[in-house]
């Protein structure tokens, strides 16, 4: 039958030549792969060896341990620890602001009996009585608050590392005291912190306060071994003062130059304007259901002034890592519902590809030292009213995210006429106020930005910032480096797909019932499915190859692959156990369906939720245990074939995406049934479940345990004519037991007979299935 086409795609039976593989790899790297290469990026290798040139980087990386520096007198900055490495007994340092703070630290070697010693402090000779009965060095902190007062020992540090620290911060002077390895800090307040200077008599280091834990570690445990070698030579403190040359915002600098090539550094300030694209697809039927609200790629072109120069810019905005939400207002055809709507949140990313007509982008082929800095922007969602035929319209309203710059790399933008080498700016997201809601529904106070109206009536969102890069260009300024992608002009594939989806959805009304049933019964293969596009066999095979490669990554192919792995695991586990049957029922061959059912409680809501999940998985079992009846995939493939033949826009580039989307999105509302004697058990993707007798169509209680047993061993049948349609048909026309059984089994001949008789109930059911074949 027609669903054979899906099984053929799943078997990956078509060979792929090397040219196709190379073409696919190049395409994937250009379109789908985003990397963050750090400070170096290139699209092609350069034709000559690069010189190192001048590397300008505005990022200051502050070392944890800066030094050692020679002894000196200076005013230390606030917020930095001065770590002094004492190498002799005597005065280690003196510090004062000449108003309310005088302090000096003297070092006492181990094993010193009480003795009077003379020290020269602040130009004065002072005598202190000192002693040290321990095996470690002692550092006495002598302090006075006025030039008229005497010094006294305020704190003592006992240390085997011989390191002393002092910090100016928060209106206080902080030092270490106690005994290593458990020395701690304490502070002394002063009214004139900024004017405190220090005279250091030993070599010292500078550590930022943000690394105070490291300073504490050094005080208590000693410096790293590399600092204790004779190869480390103290430098004068003046070597720490570097004259920084700040680059202009917009300038071109020659970094290095040879006879044919030169490296140019381009510094640019930029204004990025972008907008989100979206697609809203309404389902067929009575007009109360929406199938998809999704983000799409959006291009935007604009002009702005940069240093008095008019700049023409082009941006492409896309999103990654979207979150899928849904809303189901009920099971009736007049109940409002959205099968899937996309929301971007904290786990999502926004990509903006930027190009302008300046020299920086003219030769953007060989690039290094790429860096950027951009502001953040808040994007707030607007309102979208769902125009249902009767009743108050539900309105999706609100939602907001903030975009924060997270990286930049090279990219290529595809426009209708040319491909542009661009910069791709990546933004991470944080959710913001307000939350979004769907008025007149239960969906309230959810955070993120939904795809319904992400631009909120704004023509664009705007971000300002700057970037810098070094590009290898020709010495001849009139020469433009060839760009590989500019050899061929490529139409925007996403735009083609959007137009094709609209055409496909509009063709649903033109499909004849009899033609559909006949086509669904044919064993469609690759050639017959795609031969309607072009007559040549070679092109058809090439198309089939492209479709197969794209189809590999579809949800259906992935699910089949996972199911195969489960089968393999179940078989290997069963072979090691005595009870094969019990083991196979525990590890079922469509990802534990029987377990899901058997774990269901007697609660109606729980059964509804579980059966909805299970019914979506039963499609996989039906595909590997084909029955004589017609399946939903037969109808799906037949509709796909019909629309391909009728389409005027289908082509080699768009066909793989359309076939893959059709396998995932055609007929989202499916029902499956299992027969046992004269009883039928039926479940659907909306969570409804029925059990009824074949003869009378009278409902009987739905036995969950019985269903769990049957679903493991019995064949699964697509409920083309579902229970509601069967009951309606029997009540209005009356059908025999044989007709009922054939309709229950989805017998194609019986379906064709009812279609030929122009039965309105059966015809309406098939029409509804065709209308569900939307993209």
Curated annotation (Swiss-Prot):
Chain positions of motif DGE motif: 307-309
Residue interval(s) of motif YGL motif: 447-449
Chain intervals for the UniProt region annotation (Hydrophobic): 388-408
Pfam family name, one: VP4_helical
Region (Spike body and stalk (antigen domain)): 247-478
UniProt region (Spike foot), positions on chain: 509-775
Residue segments, region Spike head: 65-223
Superkingdom, taxonomy of origin: Viruses
Keywords for the protein's UniProt record, in alphabetical order: Capsid protein, Coiled coil, Disulfide bond, Hemagglutinin, Host cell membrane, Host cytoplasm, Host cytoskeleton, Host endoplasmic reticulum, Host membrane, Host-virus interaction, Membrane, Outer capsid protein, Viral attachment to host cell, Viral penetration into host cytoplasm, Viral penetration via permeabilization of host membrane, Virion, Virus entry into host cell
Residues of the signal peptide: none
Biological processes, Gene Ontology terms: permeabilization of host organelle membrane involved in viral entry into host cell; virion attachment to host cell
GO cellular component terms listed in the entry, alphabetical order: host cell endoplasmic reticulum-Golgi intermediate compartment; host cell plasma membrane; host cell rough endoplasmic reticulum; host cytoskeleton; membrane; viral outer capsid
Chain span(s) of sequence motif KID motif: 643-645
Site positions (Cleavage): 230-231, 240-241, 246-247
Coiled-coil segments: 483-517
Covalent S-S links between cysteines: 317-379
Remarks, miscellaneous: This strain probably does not use sialic acid to attach to the host cell.
Similarity field: Belongs to the rotavirus VP4 family.
This protein's name: Outer capsid protein VP4
Species in which this protein is naturally found: Rotavirus A (strain RVA/Human/United States/D/1974/G1P1A[8]) (RV-A)
């Amino acid at each position: 039958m027609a669903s054979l086409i899906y099984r053929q795609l799943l078997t990956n039976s078509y060979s792929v030549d090397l040219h196709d593989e190379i073409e696919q790899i190049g395409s994937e790297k250009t379109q789908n792969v985003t990397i963050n290469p750090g400070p170096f990026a290139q699209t092609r290798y350069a034709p000559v060896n690069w010189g190192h040139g001048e590397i300008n980087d505005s990022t200051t990386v502050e070392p944890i341990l800066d030094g050692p520096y020679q002894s000196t007198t200076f005013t230390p900055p606030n917020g930095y620890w001065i770590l002094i490495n004492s190498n002799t007994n005597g005065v280690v340092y003196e510090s004062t602001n000449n108003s309310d703070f005088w302090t000096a630290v003297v070092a006492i070697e181990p094993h010193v009996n009480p003795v009077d010693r003379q020290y020269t402090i602040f130009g004065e000779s002072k005598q202190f009585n000192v002693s040290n009965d321990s095996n470690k060095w002692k550092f006495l902190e002598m302090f006075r608050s006025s030039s008229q007062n005497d010094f006294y020992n305020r704190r003592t540090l006992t240390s085997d590392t011989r390191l002393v620290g002092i910090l100016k911060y928060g209106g206080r002077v902080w030092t270490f005291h106690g005994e290593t390895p458990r020395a701690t800090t304490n502070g002394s307040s002063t009214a004139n912190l900024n004017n405190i200077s220090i005279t250091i008599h030993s070599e010292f280091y500078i550590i930022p306060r943000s690394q105070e834990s490291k300073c504490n570690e050094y005080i208590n445990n000693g410096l790293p071994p590399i600092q204790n070698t004779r190869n480390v030579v103290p430098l004068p403190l003046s070597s720490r003062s570097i004259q920084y040359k700040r680059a202009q915002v917009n300038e071109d600098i020659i970094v290095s130059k040879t006879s044919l090539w030169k490296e140019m550094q381009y510094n640019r300030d930029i204004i990025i304007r972008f907008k989100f694209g979206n697609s809203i697809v309404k389902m067929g039927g009575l007009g109360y259901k929406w199938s998809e609200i999704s983000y799409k790629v959006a291009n935007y072109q604009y002009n702005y002034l940069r240093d008095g120069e008019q700049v023409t810019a082009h941006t492409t905005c896309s999103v990654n890592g979207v979150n899928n939400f849904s809303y189901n207002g009920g099971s009736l055809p007049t109940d409002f519902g959205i099968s899937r709507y996309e929301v971007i949140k904290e786990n999502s990313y926004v990509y903006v590809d930027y190009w302008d007509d300046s020299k920086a982008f003219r030769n953007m082929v060989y690039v290094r030292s790429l860096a950027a800095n951009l502001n953040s922007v808040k994007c707030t969602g607007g309102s979208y009213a769902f125009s249902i035929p009767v009743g108050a319209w539900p309105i999706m309203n609100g939602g907001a995210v903030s975009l924060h710059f997270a990286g930049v790399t090279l990219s290529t933008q595809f426009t209708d006429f040319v491909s542009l080498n661009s910069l791709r700016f990546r933004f991470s997201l944080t959710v913001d106020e307000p939350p979004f809601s769907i008025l007149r529904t239960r969906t309230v106070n959810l955070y993120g930005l939904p795809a319904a109206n992400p631009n909120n009536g704004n023509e664009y969102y705007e971000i300002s910032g700057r970037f810098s890069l070094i590009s290898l260009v020709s010495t001849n300024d009139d020469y433009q480096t060839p760009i590989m992608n500019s050899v061929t002009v490529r139409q925007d594939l996403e735009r083609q797909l959007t137009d094709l989806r609209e055409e496909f959805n509009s063709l649903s009304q033109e499909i004849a019932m009899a033609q559909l049933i006949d086509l669904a019964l044919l064993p469609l293969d690759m050639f017959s499915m795609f031969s309607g596009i072009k007559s040549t066999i070679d092109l058809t095979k090439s198309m089939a190859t492209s479709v197969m490669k794209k189809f590999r990554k579809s949800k259906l192919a992935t699910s089949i692959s996972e199911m195969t792995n489960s089968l393999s695991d179940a078989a290997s586990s069963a072979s090691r156990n005595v009870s094969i049957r019990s083991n196979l029922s525990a590890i079922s061959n469509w990802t534990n369906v029987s377990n899901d059912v058997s774990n269901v409680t007697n609660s109606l809501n729980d059964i509804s939720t579980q059966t909805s999940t299970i019914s979506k998985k039963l499609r996989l079992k039906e595909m590997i245990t084909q029955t004589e009846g017609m399946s939903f995939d037969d109808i799906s493939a037949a509709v796909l074939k019909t629309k391909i033949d009728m389409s005027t826009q289908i082509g080699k580039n768009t066909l793989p995406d359309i076939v893959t989307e059709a396998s995932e999105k055609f007929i989202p509302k499916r029902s499956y049934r299992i027969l046992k004697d004269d009883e039928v058990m039926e479940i659907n993707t909306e969570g409804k479940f029925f059990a009824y007798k074949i003869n009378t169509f009278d409902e009987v209680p739905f036995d969950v345990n019985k269903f769990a047993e049957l679903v493991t061993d019995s064949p699964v049948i697509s409920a083309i004519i579902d229970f509601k349609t069967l009951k309606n048909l029997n009540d209005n026309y009356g059908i025999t037991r044989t007709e009922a059984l054939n309709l229950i089994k989805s017998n194609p001949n019986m379906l064709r007979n009812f279609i030929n008789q122009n039965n309105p109930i059966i015809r309406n059911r098939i029409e509804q299935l065709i209308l569900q074949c939307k993209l």
